[in-house]
Design a protein with these regions (language model features):
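Short solvent-exposed coil/turn linkers within tandem alpha-helical repeat scaffolds
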Residues: 51, 124-132, 146, 160-168, ...
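Structured, soluble extracytoplasmic/luminal domains of envelope-associated proteins
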Residues: 4, 120-176
Length: 255
């Protein structure tokens, strides 16, 4: 720290004078070191400014490259994929509402026809797009309906969404697939994921019910009772609540 003399200050004796001279010398050395450090920094920047500017340039080019990719590659890719989704979606909707030939319609939705892409083509040709993500959901549900459970697990497992309905339905679909494959423990985990995913009047009581029934099968009666009781308490108007008292009785009796 610098030492300053007051105006008119005189040292009391020689020892005091010597001490002041030493302080002034130390202060001068500190400022000299700071000046040398600043000079070395300026010298380094001057010597390496091409490197520094080049490094900044690399960052700028990378950022511009990302923005250009998003604007000129990813966005057009998303638009193209979304346009392709229209054709298989029509067959998927028809299959859901059909009473006969469901599998034929689902196959058209999956594989396409008349030169048009199906869901599987969109997944392969437009990876990373929102349309490909939705195509995974639709393909998984189609395979589930066609009783091709491993394929259903693959595609539903590749789907991700924050949507409270689609996200829950995908988790529940995985539960259904594992249940059909004779893996109730795995199924229960996905049913629990499904009703925990969001809280609404449709998917929550549906998967609480499936989780409860599966828990009964696994002899986890306390857990089953908890799920059935929640339906009774929180979703009294849901379809699943109509016979819930009987299931509550089964869970309590241990049957």
């Amino acid at each position: 720290m610098a030492t300053y003399k007051k105006r008119g200050f005189k040292p009391k004796d020689k020892d005091e004078e010597k001490r002041l001279e030493e302080q002034e010398s130390t202060t001068a050395e500190v400022f000299s070191s700071l000046d040398q450090g600043a000079s070395r920094t300026e010298e380094w920047v001057s010597t390496n400014q091409n490197y520094i500017l080049g490094f900044i340039g690399v960052i700028a080019v990378g950022l511009l490259g990302y923005l250009a990719y998003d604007q000129f590659v990813q966005k057009p890719k998303d638009i193209g994929a979304a346009n392709e989704l229209y054709y298989p979606q029509q067959y998927f909707d028809l299959a859901l509402n059909a009473t006969t030939e469901k599998d034929s319609l689902f196959n058209l939705a999956l594989n396409g026809a008349e030169g048009k892409y199906g869901f599987l083509d969109i997944i392969e040709e437009y990876p990373g797009t929102k349309a490909a993500n939705l195509a995974n959901y639709a393909a998984g549900m189609a395979y589930l309906s066609m009783q091709k459970y491993q394929e259903a697990i693959t595609h539903l497992g590749n789907f991700s969404s924050d949507d409270e309905m689609l996200g829950a339905m995908a988790k529940g679909g995985l539960g259904d697939a594992f249940m059909q494959l004779g893996q109730p423990s795995d199924a229960l985990g996905y049913y629990e994921n499904a009703f925990e995913f969001s809280n609404n009047q449709y998917t929550t009581p549906r998967f609480l019910y499936k989780a409860g029934v599966t828990a009964l099968e696994l002899k986890q009666n306390a857990k089953a009772l908890q799920y059935f009781q929640r339906i009774k308490d929180d979703f009294a108007t849901a379809d699943e609540a109509r016979t819930i008292d009987a299931f509550i009785g089964m869970a309590k009796s241990g049957k």
